[in-house]
């Protein structure tokens, strides 16, 4: 968590910071998954992660202005903090609600990418595989 805090405590998000954050983000999500001890869930997520835009960091960088990017990434990372605390306290229902809400950030980003295909395509060339063009 401190690595993510450090990366997002900058004035400007560079491609290097995005890459470092994405790696940290993937480790965080994998750590939560592994800690579940649910082998069926682990296998299902592994299969899901082979789909376009499905893995945890698939839609990074965000597809908006740099200021909005920073705000969204800070929001998503704050959700990481809240989820981890809820899990530590054994708050199952809250953890589930936070995890579901956390997926909304990716969905918002994907909707923005689809709405702004011309601007999004250079950042995420694979978007053409999903929506054509």
Task: Cite the ranges covered by each PLM segment.
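C-terminal all-alpha effector/ligand-binding and dimerization domain
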Residues: 57-133
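Conserved amphipathic alpha-helical segments that form helical-bundle/coiled-coil interaction surfaces
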Residues: 1-62, 79-86, 94-106
């Amino acid at each position: 968590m401190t690595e993510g805090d450090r990366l997002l405590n900058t004035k400007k998000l560079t491609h290097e910071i995005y890459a470092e954050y994405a790696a940290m983000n993937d480790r965080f999500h994998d750590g939560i998954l592994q800690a579940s001890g649910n082998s069926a869930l682990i296998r299902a997520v592994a299969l899901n992660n082979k789909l376009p835009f499905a893995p945890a960091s698939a839609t990074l960088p965000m597809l908006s202005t740099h200021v909005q990017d920073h705000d969204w990434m800070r929001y998503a990372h704050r959700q990481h903090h809240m989820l981890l605390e809820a899990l530590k306290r054994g708050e199952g229902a809250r953890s589930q609600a936070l995890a579901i809400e956390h997926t909304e950030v990716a969905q918002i980003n994907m909707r923005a990418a689809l709405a702004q295909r011309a601007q999004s395509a250079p950042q995420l060339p694979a978007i053409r595989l999903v929506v054509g063009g």
